[in-house]
Amino acid sequence: MTHILAIDQGTTSSRAIIFDASMNITASAQEEFAQHYPDSGWVEHDPGDLWATTAGTCRAAIEKAGLKPEDIAAIGITNQRETVVVWDKTSGQPVYNAIVWQDRRTAAYCKTLRDEGHDKMITARTGLLADPYFSATKLKWILDNVEGARDRATRGELLFGTVDTFLIWKLTGGAAHVTDATNAARTSLYDIHKGRWSQTICALFDIPQQMLPEVKDCAADFGVTRSDLFGRPVPILGVAGDQQAATIGQACFEPGMLKSTYGTGCFALLNTGDTAVASSNRLLTTIAYQFDGKPTYALEGSIFVAGAVVQWLRDGLQTIRKASETQAMAERADPNQNVVLVPAFVGLGAPYWDAECRGAVFGLTRNSGPDEFARAALESVGYQTRDLLDAMTADWQGSDVRATLRVDGGMSASDWAMQFLSDIIDAPVDRPKVLETTALGAAWLAGQRAGLYPDQAGFAASWALEKTFAPQMDAALRDRKYAAWKRAVDATLRF
């Protein structure tokens, strides 16, 4: 047993990655699935698609790697967070589509929660906001709107899970109804201080606690797969939500260590050690990982549009054919043009949390063209990251959160974007050799539990740097550019 199978179940596709005994990738497979938009602001997945693409990519990756069933020592799972699945305990059939983390159908209910003053209690216990982003209101919606669902849940006939829980249920043939602390911490039902489901919040949302999964450490025994899936039973030994898995994959194990993942959106997590820091700047307080029953906490900032701004250049403006073109365009852009893009296509995330505002462009002249738009698009990601780091610095007083920022995700491959990021935050930006940090984090959780991979200290020592981007921008220019960004955001919020 020399390999680890990492399952990375994401928002638009399912992936399976095989890691060898030295934590090198030997094979992978990926399959996209359909997105469903039944109403304005609604986003759903067919749970059957989540399962079929996961099982299919696992088999494909194992076949590509040329492995036998006995070669797989363990499975690690990482997943899109907050997405909700409810299914029948006996048949395993979902009662409704999975409601995705992006879904905003419960916005009016969340406003009612805030108006009635429940948001402070929710934040105090869970570290989260009263926002449709999180699982609790989605689960309540299913129980309230699917015929018979609430009665069946009360009778103990239905089960709830985030995507990891649903996949483990399917992988084990219904033998395990479990989750890990990082996924539980994103539901708005879990008390991150007491380490258990909150009776008070479950009562507020009218959620029967019997439908909630058992919560385990990130590295634990989550069950074994059905023998018919991969030729033999394989233990599932590691689970973490995608951004927490990336934090682990980046070896951000010490307080003050910070990572930022640049995909469709951007998620920055700051390790705050054994202290759950309450944010005064609308960041999220969450669990970074949990070992041996002891949680390590983090401050998290979420940006809704990062890599998606480049997709907008390609699909919306149609000024590029592929993302890699933006680097040369940004280099060609007229330095005397001060175009600022606020990419609030779906609102603004942390620290603003305004779901209603929309994107805007400032500083246009007759000479502004595709190159200036490309530069403004890449710069917007750096500006938003600085917003997060400023908020983190204010929340975690006395600590330098800008010592070094570790980056990963598709957009981190852009040298221009990473150099601008370093310039605007005035701190070094480290890009690792292994950019598949999310899958690596899940693989390490399972591998070290299986005895195949090194312990935490050994894994941290194995983290390898590909390139450091150091600040080069003049301080006065940095201040002028960021001040222009802040004015642009203020105008966007007031529009």
Swiss-Prot record:
Inhibited by fructose 1,6-bisphosphate (FBP). GO terms for molecular function: ATP binding; glycerol kinase activity. It holds the Pfam family FGGY_C. The keyword ATP-binding applies. Keywords: ATP-binding, Glycerol metabolism, Kinase, Nucleotide-binding, Transferase. Glycerol binds at R81, E82, Y133, D242, Q243. Sn-glycerol 3-phosphate binds at T11, R81, E82, Y133, D242. ADP binds at T11, R15, T264, G307, G410. Pathway: Polyol metabolism; glycerol degradation via glycerol kinase pathway; sn-glycerol 3-phosphate from glycerol: step 1/1. The keyword Hydrolase does not apply. Its EC number is 2.7.1.30. GO terms for cellular component: cytosol. ATP binds at T11, T12, S13, T264, G307, Q311, G410. One of its GO terms (biological process) is glycerol catabolic process. It catalyses: glycerol + ATP = sn-glycerol 3-phosphate + ADP + H(+). CDD domains: FGGY_EcGK_like. InterPro entries: ATPase_NBD (IPR043129), Carb_kinase_FGGY (IPR000577), Carb_kinase_FGGY_CS (IPR018483), FGGY_C (IPR018485), FGGY_N (IPR018484), Glycerol_kin (IPR005999). HAMAP family: Glycerol_kin. Key enzyme in the regulation of glycerol uptake and metabolism. Catalyzes the phosphorylation of glycerol to yield sn-glycerol 3-phosphate. Belongs to the FGGY kinase family. NCBIfam families: glycerol_kin (TIGR01311), PRK00047.1 (NF000756). This is Glycerol kinase.
